[in-house]
Amino acid sequence: MRLALAAVLVLALAGCGSDETGNDAASTTPPATVTVTETETVSAEPEVTCSTAGLRLTLPEQELPAEVADVRKRVFDAAVACDYDTLEEIALEQGAGFTFTYGGETDASDYWARLEEEGTQKPMRALATILTLPYTRNESGSYAWPTAYSERPTDEAWQALVDAGLYTQEQIDQMKTAGSYLGWRTAITADGDWQFFVAGD
């Protein structure tokens, strides 16, 4: 009889111990985590597309002095990238005197950026394109592009501008009537000084 009572007491105590363990486990269960995501609306700035975007040009090798070839390549790469600041740095490497407009503007990079943004003219596309065309020598002996920029441009020189997509035949005819090429042109001296990139007169 005593053995039976002892067994009942042991089972009762064991049952109490298991309830406490369950309560302890329940009390230590971490609370559920709630994540709240906030969405911030940012107004996007209008994107200005460079006129060379999508333009596939290869700069052909030309028989030029090393200094001229180097500057030509650097100018071409910067023009394709619409890197106005680098272009201005190249323009001023050998001092002031670089011509980029016949107006009153004083900052070349700002001027080119404004023209690109307005979209009425495409100076970077023009610069990259004319540097892929044959060159000529201007009155000061500098290496100049395109060949239409000469005293007596040939029909082939005029046609090259149309084929390159820089000007329409009507625009070329107007320049011929005016007596000279007044489009975008550029020149580099024999010692590698980038002299100008300009249009008009």
Where on the chain are the PLM-derived regions?
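Short helix-adjacent coil turns
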Residues: 75-87
